[in-house]
Amino acid sequence: MRSGLAAAAAIIAVVTGFHAAIWYSLRPEGTAPAVTERFSSLSFAPYSRDVRHPDKGPPVTADQIRSDVNAVADYTRAIRTYSSTLGLDLIPAIAAERGLKVSVGAWIDKDETRNALEIQNAVALTKQNSNVDALVVGNETIFRGEKSAAEMAELIRSVKRQTNVPVTTGEIWNVWLDHPELVSAVDYIAAHILPYWEGVTAENVVDRSIDIYNRLRAAYPGKRIVIAEFGWPSAGYNRDGAVPGDIAQANVIRTFVSRAEALGIEYNIIEAFDAPWKSFEGSVGQYWGIFDADRHLKFPLSGPITEPTYGRTALLALLLGVALSLPMLRLQRMTASQAAFLGSAAAGVGAWTALVLDYWATHYVTGGNYVTLVISLALLGPLAMVVLYRIEELSSILFGRPPERLVELRPRGAPSRYPKVSIHIPAYREPPEMLKQTLDAVARLNWPNLECVVVLNNTPDPALVEPVRAHCATLGERFKFLNVEKMSGFKAGALRIALDHTAPDAEIIGVIDSDYVVHPDWLKDLVPVFEDPTVGLVQAPQDHRDAHLSPMHEAMNAEYA
């Protein structure tokens, strides 16, 4: 027993070692140029992870802004805002405390009352704060279809007359190519270049962005051009060839910053912080920050790039795999291949569970998402246990030792005596032809002293009853036919009724289903076992009657038997 446990434990250790090797070999790593200087600029939205939407909550506080400014001050030379209301007008003064330049934003949409307030506040901020070096009127307003290029050009000219800082608007790069009249109205082009939305792969995104920048330079020579938004999400859905991820985000941003600095390109990274409140943008809108929602830097700015939670997930997968492997230590007569198979299955379930938990731990989820998680685990957890249980059965068939026969069959000869056997067959709405084959098999048994009690229960259809009744009559008086049209207890109830009609001199009762075709020597082989007074029950698995019909039937029979 101890040697068997030791062998099983050794196999679990070996499987766990292979499992660990797989995790190690698949560990994601990346390399990219280091960010040696502070970023040129970061999009800055100082909302905590508890904010559901900036427009639907209280104004952001000075303390929150100051905390977030302190979080980014060591990593950037400037920040860009998108609105000048609801507390965001406090940003320039607080940013000045840490020496940060600010591109002030005025949010423009169809609400003209708010538009007027946004512009009024933004213009005032340019006059009150010397660290404000630009005013961005609107953000993708033309792209959203809320104003035309002509309307935005006129609005920008109006704002330029009210301030001395450069004035522009933020738009997707192709809007600038399509609207030269907009270019003539602004002091510089603030182009949003986000190849993720074009389905560009992470490997090609920087080249694509530089190419777009050069197209803008060629179209508008001499015009100052700023890449006002560039970034890559760390999570979310794939968009054609664009695949988000922690490693991809770090590679893309570090490579882009290196190229931009070398080429003298002005840029702004979107964005400083992950934005859980952007759940309305789908699964990707929340993950563009270089800091997570708790203000932790998501990737190193120099050196190797690694998945931050990968090691934790791998360790959890290994521990779960070992824990799920422990029940197999109770199995007796287990082979090495069987143990390896079971251990591998447990490791697979452990890895799946760890990956599911890692997803929920590293993504921003709503209350509804948590309800989904609880329901999913409630459904999938038992399913995983059922799968492991079925795999245990499969392993015993494929890799286990052949079953041991607990009863030594005696040489087939004439038994010393023939005790009477009463064979009970319960049936419920069964096809008559099938049941007749079962009865014929009983009639062919090499046992002279037997009776057969057939109990049809809850079967009111005469077409199912009368053929069986007639066949029992044909087979003779040894076959007792009972038709109980209404009864409770299902099969157990039918067997109780059969007991009431069992011959008083019957010493042994045999029970078979209505679709069993027993071997002629069934009783001849098993009845002698009851000569041992300690034996009260003998169970003999029955092969499927139709195993020969197809490979599927044969496989089902093999699994059952």
What do the PLM-derived regions correspond to, one by one?
Residues 472-502, 506-507, 520-561:
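Long helical/loop segments within the catalytic core of UDP-sugar-dependent glycosyltransferases
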Residues 104, 133, 171-209, 232-233:
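Aromatic- and acid-rich polysaccharide-binding/catalytic face
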Residues 327-415:
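N-terminal membrane-anchoring/stem segments of glycan-assembly enzymes
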Residues 419-422, 451, 456:
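Cell-envelope/extracellular polymer assembly enzymes that use nucleotide-activated donors
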Residues 512-517:
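The conserved acidic donor/metal-binding loop of glycosyltransferases
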Residues 439-449:
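Short, acidic, metal-binding catalytic loop of nucleotide-sugar glycosyltransferases
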Residues 448, 456-468, 485-488:
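A conserved acidic beta->alpha catalytic loop
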Residues 33-36, 41, 47-49, 53-57, ...:
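Aromatic-rich peripheral "rim/lid" segments of glycoside hydrolase catalytic domains that contact
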